[in-house]
Amino acid sequence: MEGENTTDPPYTTAASSGQSIFVRPPPIAPVLATTSNFSQSELKELHSMSIASTGFVSQSVPYSVTAQWGTNAAASSNVNPIPQASPMLANAPFGRPGTLAPPGLMTSPPAFPGSNPFSTTPRPGMSAGPAQMNPGIHPHMYPPYHSLPGTPQGMWLQPPSMGGIPRAPFLSHPTTFPGSYPFPVRGISPNLPYSGSHPLGASPMGSVGNVHALPGRQPDISPGRKTEELSGIDDRAGSQLVGNRLDAWTAHKSEAGVLYYYNSVTGQSTYEKPPGFGGEPDKVPVQPIPVSMESLPGTDWALVSTNDGKKYYYNNKTKVSSWQIPAEVKDFGKKLEERAMESVASVPSADLTEKGSDLTSLSAPAISNGGRDAASLKTTNFGSSALDLVKKKLHDSGMPVSSTITSEANSGKTTEVTPSGESGNSTGKVKDAPGAGALSDSSSDSEDEDSGPSKEECSKQFKEMLKERGIAPFSKWEKELPKIIFDPRFKAIPSHSVRRSLFEQYVKTRAEEERREKRAAHKAAIEGFRQLLDDASTDIDQHTDYRAFKKKWGNDLRFEAIERKEREGLLNERVLSLKRSAEQKAQEIRAAAASDFKTMLREREISINSHWSKVKDSLRNEPRYRSVAHEDREVFYYEYIAELKAAQRGDDHEMKARDEEDKLRERERELRKRKEREVQEVERVRQKIRRKEASSSYQALLVEKIRDPEASWTESKPILERDPQKRASNPDLEPADKEKLFRDHVKSLYERCVHDFKALLAEALSSEAATLQTEDGKTALNSWSTAKQVLKPDIRYSKMPRQDREVVWRRYVEDISRKQRHENYQEEKQRDYKT
């Protein structure tokens, strides 16, 4: 990426260790204010000192990228606070410093084999003897740092020597060591701590004694140990074959999101996908990025937060990072807690109200939870590292703080690194993670230190710079980068991704902004020209033309601000309005004169039969006659005569119109009556249909509910009104109609029962049954009790009302007797006729 620090190393996980932890905490280093006045050699020296001072292991990316650092550093305006990879040899042999490794993993130490084929390689934790160096290859030298005292380090990380003799760094994890016969690290003394006990890339809190690796000396190895160590020796070709195994390759992403691959056996890194790589590069997450650093008052430690919510501790003096809680921080937290317990009932010190600032207090629960679970910190702009805001806050429990603690709390500083792709409003907000305890932010004392530009101000200044540089809409980053890279406002944004996102946002919205600015400028120019017309109103009348106006006002800036076509249009609009005003005024004067002239004629009783030649002689002395122009007098006269004729015609027309209106009103009245009759007829038909439908539904209800021919209306009415369909309460059916329908239904039921009973009598009382007599000599035709015994088993007998059964039986018997007598009479008559 042009003009950017392309060697920002990504953060990766320890692929070779089999654990899903960070190889090292994300490094945090002080930000250099500016490098615009540094030479290329000074930039390289500062870069080397940054690597030596951080205490982290070297990090490597493909050489094609890292080799350009020296060239791009001079053009870059923002020195990356993360330690960079040192320039390496392009084609170094296996195990040499030129071998590439992923971030957080140390390349093989710069030890070169001697003439003895069985020479050994220094191991972690062993004393090294003098070793012959290859004079043709210059290994990477770590510059001495005389300003800091030597700190004993663990066997898994050796910082640069504090003396004048350079010392090679140690490996951060077990791997193959260079030499005549590469072999894995084994046989480490048990009194040394295991490298996994501390996070890779960070030095342990305590010192590990008797662990030194002096370059130039071979380790003192006994024959027994050498035999054990040489048991797994293989030649270099075999090691290279192992390094080519596909399972040794892992995928990682840099801070900028660039995907690269690393071989854990050979220590090589490449941007090209290895042949046969079976992983899923698309699922590789972007490594965490440090976003803020909160100094812990009373200590040299700071709590660093990453963009994924994890936190670790960083020492500002020794440049050491650790996931674990440093002992110094624990002790300081315990002291604060003890002081709080001792003075719970005391009143807070008056020192707290001198400047209205609070103090930061660390509670034991917040410290004991460790860096990952500590409270989220308030972040400020990274570009304001010169500001180093100091904030203070009291503990919620009202813990009093002495002046000593106040001075320690004032030393805490908060810085922020804006991660790529992030745009937050975290400034000014406090976020507490669960279980974070009382670890809180501190407020700044603005009287002691100057306030630098905030993140929003830097972004605003960056966009103003783009506007001043004339960045065109929809332009490309690569094309416009040379125009803006050396501007101080470009350097105020520390992150490349934030710069580019601001650039992309600007070029996308710039077109619309230019259109708005152009419209606003054009509108302002038009308003200025109108103001010019107002100022020149005394020189403009209904006869003014463009040439005359330009001759007098053409040198005015407001005149030249718009085009000629618009100038002419606005001037003609103003002149046209003046013309219309003059014409309207003249018309009003002429109308008033005409009204006075016609009033004069009306007073003289001029009729439609008068002649103008005679009338004008009689009006010569009238002032109203003389006030009218000569050519308008006769015109007004004939207008008045036309009005008289129109009035006369109007009277006749009005009379005719009145007659027509009377006739029209009569026709409308008749039409309205006819429509009313039609509407009434339609409504009557609709009412009849609704009543018929209501009667049908009510009859259906009677069929469903009333089945007894002896049912009464008073008893059946409540039953019918409980119908869910409300058929008994239809408004289209009157109560009298309901009762009539009920009685008709009951009557039909009774008639049906009588008909069925008569049919039963006809079936049961046949001639054979009539001849059957009981012991008393009774038959079904002459005895109701006998007939009842015959009819009772049939259901039609039970349906017939009790009081009407015998009556119907007697009528039926009488009919049968009458028919029988008639038949007998006919037979006798027939017989007599024959005889």
UniProtKB/Swiss-Prot annotation:
Cellular localisation: Nucleus
The residues covered by the WW domain are: 243-276, 295-328
Q: InterPro entries given for it?
A: FF_domain, FF_domain_sf, TCRG1-like, WW_dom, WW_dom_sf
Q: Name one Pfam family in it.
A: WW
Please state every residue range assigned to the domain named FF.
455-509, 519-577, 590-643, 691-748, 750-815
Main location, first listed in the record? nucleus
Tissue expr: Expressed in roots, shoots, rosette leaves, cauline leaves, stems and flowers.
GO terms assigned for molecular function = RNA polymerase binding
Q: One of this protein's GO BP terms?
A: RNA splicing
Q: Name one GO cellular component term.
A: nucleus
Where is composition skewed (Polar residues) in this entry?
Answer: 1-20, 400-428
Region feature Disordered, mapped onto this chain: 1-22, 397-459, 649-677, 714-738
Q: Does the keyword Nucleus apply?
A: yes
Q: Is Repeat among the key words of this record?
A: yes
CDD domains annotated for this entry? WW
What SUPFAM superfamilies does UniProt report for this protein, alphabetically? FF domain, WW domain
The UniProt keywords, alphabetically, are:
mRNA processing, mRNA splicing, Nucleus, Repeat
The cross-references to SMART domains, in alphabetical order and at most eight, read: FF, WW
Q: Which family does it belong to?
A: Belongs to the PRPF40 family.
The UniProt function text for this chain reads: Binds the phosphorylated C-terminal domain (CTD) of the largest subunit of RNA polymerase II and functions as a scaffold for RNA processing machineries. May be involved in pre-mRNA splicing.
Its subunit composition reads: Interacts (via the WW domains) with the phosphorylated C-terminal domain of NRPB1 (via CTD domain).
| UniProt protein name | Pre-mRNA-processing protein 40C
Species annotation: Arabidopsis thaliana
High-level lineage: Eukaryota, Viridiplantae, Streptophyta, Embryophyta, Tracheophyta
